[in-house]
């Protein structure tokens, strides 16, 4: 990333504090957005709202957050706001 230049955000972004359901069923809370230090892409930082998670926080590229996926033969949005 060029110092002082922040990549543009798309019009639709998750907001810190919002809760989302992953297409497989688990719930997550958005912590915020971050810029990947090597790739200059926006990342969503989120935490699981279920017990025994593999990590305290996760990240996912913002462009994947609302993308469509096929799960058990059904098209779903990767994360749906609850």
Predicted stretch roles:
Residues 1-82:
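Mixed-charge, low-complexity intrinsically disordered regions
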């Amino acid at each position: 990333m060029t110092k002082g230049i922040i990549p543009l955000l798309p019009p639709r972004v998750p907001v810190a504090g919002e809760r989302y359901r992953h297409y497989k069923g688990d719930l997550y809370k958005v912590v915020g957005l971050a810029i990947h230090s090597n790739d200059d892409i926006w990342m969503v930082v989120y935490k699981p709202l279920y017990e025994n998670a593999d990590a305290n926080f996760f990240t996912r590229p913002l462009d994947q957050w609302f993308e469509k996926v096929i799960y058990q033969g059904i098209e779903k949005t990767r994360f749906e706001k609850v």
